Amino acid sequence: MHTLVFCSFKGGTGKTTLSLNVGCNLAQFLGKKVLLADLDPQSNLSSGLGASVRSNQKGLHDIVYTSNDLKSIICETKKDSVDLIPASFLSEQFRELDIHRGPSNNLKLFLNEYCAPFYDICIIDTPPSLGGLTKEAFVAGDKLIACLTPEPFSILGLQKIREFLSSVGKPEEEHILGIALSFWDDRNSTNQMYIDIIESIYKNKLFSTKIRRDISLSRSLLKEDSVANVYPNSRAAEDILKLTHEIANILHIEYERDYSQRTT
């Protein structure tokens, strides 16, 4: 099972939207069994899949901070071949947990023992912060996808990733799968400047597919579904499907020819 961590260190980068839509695309178009894991206390990934998070809901927080058998927290969604580990309200209390504490490894162990035999891919949606929960996700993940926007503070956040990876003992060049840019506008005169900055920090890590601005993304979230399912002819559906294939190709994920033909 591939475990991908979608992260950003500021809000509004499209991180959760990409987590949800790439995960759903991997199931719908590539025929994979996907587990989406919501580690963000805002619970937007859970909400975007139509999951109602109760005040006593067990979720990823419980895996990270206990060692109990929590197989029962995995929920089915209305999307075929997509399951969810929902967020927990308790995780809000630990959002800025001491970053210097040692990781528990509970999340990594849980995914390896209980999930890996049944899923092809796990996608973890992290908080937009440098707290303990994000650290746990970095330890558990095989690869990291950094989600950015073509804006100064978002781009400069890449430097924090380097420091953060060092803190969990993972080689940055091996651990970073790619960098995804959302809210892209082809007419923006500063595009090349931002691309050059990204390349200077992480050479050859920027995905070739950029996610253009499209109101269809927010509208699909309100409908609790993927943009490819609700607005299949939209720019966003086209872009995220291309990004999904780009990710799959980098990971050497095999899929049936019938599924690849459905992308056209």
UniProtKB/Swiss-Prot annotation:
The keyword Nucleotide-binding belongs to this UniProt entry's keyword annotation: yes
SUPFAM superfamilies, per the entry: P-loop containing nucleoside triphosphate hydrolases
Gene3D superfamilies: P-loop containing nucleotide triphosphate hydrolases (3.40.50.300)
Superkingdom of origin organism: Bacteria
Pfam families for this protein: AAA_31
Keywords tagged on the record: ATP-binding, Nucleotide-binding, Plasmid
Other comment: The sequence shown is that of plasmid pLGV440.
Protein name: Virulence plasmid ParA family protein pGP5-D
Organism: Chlamydia trachomatis
Organismal lineage: Bacteria, Pseudomonadati, Chlamydiota, Chlamydiia, Chlamydiales
